[in-house]
Swiss-Prot record:
The keyword Lipid metabolism applies. This is GDSL esterase/lipase At1g31550. It comes from Arabidopsis thaliana. Keywords: Glycoprotein, Hydrolase, Lipid degradation, Lipid metabolism, Secreted, Signal. Pfam families: Lipase_GDSL.
Amino acid sequence: MASLDSHVLMKLGSLFLSTLFVSIVSSESQCRNFESIISFGDSIADTGNLLGLSDHNNLPMSAFPPYGETFFHHPTGRFSDGRLIIDFIAEFLGLPYVPPYFGSTNGNFEKGVNFAVASATALESSFLEEKGYHCPHNFSLGVQLKIFKQSLPNLCGLPSDCRDMIGNALILMGEIGANDYNFPFFQLRPLDEVKELVPLVISTISSAITELIGMGGRTFLVPGGFPLGCSVAFLTLHQTSNMEEYDPLTGCLKWLNKFGEYHSEQLQEELNRLRKLNPHVNIIYADYYNASLRLGREPSKYGFINRHLSACCGVGGPYNFNLSRSCGSVGVEACSDPSKYVAWDGLHMTEAAHKSMADGLVKGPYAIPPFDWSCLSSMIKKKEVVGNTIFFDE
């Protein structure tokens, strides 16, 4: 009888500790009413920074039609036909679209600020250039973070106010790091050589998060990489007659997708380490890899055509892509219905694909751990945002 009582007590003690642990974790991931979005990254989140930084004689392709045609009805500097993932997240939160920091005339950054620049890398461009990887500019993650810190007096004034602003913001960390791999892959560098960059990229992202935590950051959305083997550009560049290199279900290159998985796995391991070191901080992994891959596995389920590996805007070849005649060039037209396509220009996605990706993040299951929006539902229903339309069901 005594042994049974002891067993019961142990069970009760275990249950108490488990309940206590869940309560502690839940309290740290409880619903928060974000007052703004602070964004870093590359073209996946760039809402116009590269355009604002560019000389009028050397504008990016995103400055020309048909970019922006679907929603804004004119080019905005976004590398898509319309809105990006960050735009749909802003809509869901009832916030205005996050303005680019560069090139904004009388920009209002009270509800958000975006430092993401197309073609940006995680690692410093000088480091990559030394390895022989050409970078078009140096707006690495470190540079973006430095500019953010320099801008704080104008953004929020006093240090205490800035700490509050950062603490009440959803901080979007990318996607960043893809170009660190894209540039050498475009130069046909060996896989093992590119793989050596992964720990350096992960460490750089981790250091940036740690620095922002020290500045008061409490909630981070950290995207992983995309399935590079499904990129129209890489499918064109690495085209082969060996069908064993392709996934029979998606048509994507298996070896490149495995590389993307490796990056995402390493990033998740590092985020787990950061969570243990900072239990008061909510670090959410955005599974861009699987949120994107599902569109290739079952395109018709999500409203896309079965030829999901064909660019909407492009010309030539089996994937409607030619790097020397890219979208935005004279004579290169877009498809009649971009909403049926996953790929926009061979390197970036359509607005429809971005909406599906964002939907998978804010409503799960591609946010790990998932967001808790319980305190936002009534607010979002009541809030009116001029020029924005909320597409997510409550």
